[in-house]
Structure formats: C-alpha cells, structure tokens
Amino acid sequence: SDGGVLDASMDYLRYRYEEDQYLNSQDTLFGDMDGGIHLYSGQANLVWPFSKSFTFHAGAKTSFVSIDNNADYNRLQGDSWQPDHDLSCDFQYDENINAGYIQLDAKFSSVSLEAGLRLENTRIEGEQSGNAYQRDSSFTNHYTHLFPTLSVQYALRNGNSLSLTYGKRIVRPNYRDLNPFVYIHDEYTYDKGNTLLRPELSDNLELAYIHGDLFRVGLAFNYTKDVIIKSYLDQGNYVVYVSPENLSSRVSVGPRLSTSQLPLTSFWNVNVSASLIYNRYRLPENYQVKVNKRWTPNIGISNQFSFARTWSAELIGFYNGKMAAGQATIYPLWQINAGIQKKIWKGRGT
C-alpha cells in the first residue's frame, strides 16, 4: 500500500476590543467595556492507507482559551458620575479542550463505509469579580464525551446510491453568551450572558437516496439535549433581560429534497432545496408553556438563465414557514432577488 501522511500544526490568536456605551434617558448612563481573548491550539493528524480497501485515520488536538473582560458603568447623579455597582464587573474565563479520534474507511465493490470515534475532555474555570455591593462568584465545569460517527453508502445501478449517516455532535456556548456582562440596548432591554450554560449534545440520523449528481431526497432525524436559546425575563421594573439558557430538549424530523443544476431546458437550470420539518421543544418546568411544536415548510429556488452568448439572468427566492424556536414562534419569512448580466469587451468584463 502507499505510505501514510502525518501533518501537524499550531495556531495562536489574539483578539482585543474596546467599547463605550452612552444611554441618555431619564437616567444618563455611561459604560466602558474592554477585554481580550488569547487562543492557543495544536493538532496532529495521521492518514494511513494500509490496503487498497482500508484507510486508517487518527489524530489529536488541544486548545487553550483565556478571556479577560471588564465592564465599568457610571450613572450621572446630579452633577457627578457615580459607579453603578449592579452593572459593573470583571470576568475571567479559562478553557482547555483535549480531543483524540480514530476513523476507519473501507471501500468495496458497491459499499463504502466510514466509522469513527472521537473522545473529548473539556475543563472550564471562570470567575466574576465582585465589588462592595456584589459577591465574587466562581464556577468550574469538567465533562468528557464520546462522539461516534457512521456513514454507509451503497451504490446502485446507473450512478445512483443509498446513504445512511449517523453522528453525535457537540455545540458549545459561544464566549459572548458565557460573558455575564450586561449590554444595554435601551432603557427597557438588557442583554446578559449566562456562565451556567451547558453545551448542546445532538444525535443526527439521515437516510437518503442520491440520484447521480442531480438530486438527493432523504429523511432526517435530530435529537438535541440542552438546546441553547435566548430567553426573555421580565424583572418587573419595566426592564426585560435577554439571556441565553438551556432548554430540556428538541426533536426535529422530516423529509428533505435538494437538486444541483437540474436542467429544465437548454437555457434554464434550477437548484431546489425543500424540507418539511417537525420541531418539538420541551421547555423547563418554570415556563407556562411546557411544549412548543410545529411543522415548518421551507423551500429555496435558484434559477439560472442563459440567453445567447453574452446575456444571463438569475432569479432566486425562498420561503420559510411559521416555525417553533425555543419559547418563541417565528412567523413566515420570504424573499425574492433577481439579476441580469451582460458580458462586454469580448468576455473580459461584465
């Protein structure tokens, strides 16, 4: 067999930001926020084809993230600025993720198989410094998960195939959602992070029929635990806090259809993406509504037209039906775009 390939890489990212907020209403408020992110990562991957039918993959990755953010709010009282201790704080966050994976690819006359397993360990430590009016708060979170994947493709006649895929995935909270700082949109709406957020864990299964390069039709199922959504909390003082939190679970199931450059005529190609998805959210016990569920149709169509040698046009549109999204219901949304193109200067310009 051919020799294997080993590659390794290291990365460093530094991000710095500063932001001032000035809110002029019945109470004048000024906020000074700054912070920085340092990210270090390294990874190594091995690909080893040890026969004509089998290829082995393995790899490891580690990353370290350090975040230090500071928010300093002052409120105008009379002729002087006074610190607002309810909104001001300092937040430090450290995260270490270590992961390793193995995967085996097998190819036979009519069957292709990919099976893998990834192990991830995450360690998080955070601290929100207090002041004379707020206590210091610190938190830690350690968790380890296994993520299996499986993909089986069976080749039929005439270039068509059947595909079965399964994968367990993780979606971690973004760093802004974990940041406990208060961001003031206006005097009635505050945005605040949540240091207690847990990652989303999902199981994804799809059975599909693939007709050459023209279209794909399938049935997909998804179960997600600890779904992260934006919640809206009324504090009773005419202020609504928008904050991310974990829901109990979400189930999504439904058929999907997609085409790729389907030729309707000699001058007209179309791409279609359509689905009918059932979403069901189970909400925490403290919500008045315990379940939010709905069937949602979605369709997107892209048409490409060619006229003679130098003229072409495009017509694109989509429609997303009424959808359940956490504790909210999103009303239908649609859009249509059109464009026309003319080649000039013997094709060197448009």
Label each region the model flagged.
Residues 1-127, 155, 215-219, 251-277, ...:
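Face-selective signature of the C-terminal outer-membrane beta-barrel domain
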Residues 16-18, 68, 77-80, 123-130, ...:
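Surface-exposed extracellular loop regions of Gram-negative outer-membrane beta-barrel proteins
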Residues 25-32, 82-90, 132-139, 186-195, ...:
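Extracellular loop and loop/strand-boundary signature of outer-membrane beta-barrel proteins
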Residues 36-40, 94-98, 142-146, 201-205, ...:
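Residues that define the transmembrane beta-barrel architecture of outer-membrane proteins
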Residues 88-97, 141, 170-218, 223, ...:
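Outer-membrane beta-barrel signature, preferentially recognizing the C-terminal barrel domain
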Residues 150, 292-350:
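Conserved C-terminal beta-signal and adjacent last beta-strands/turns
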Residues 221-222, 246-320:
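Gram-negative outer-membrane beta-barrel transporters
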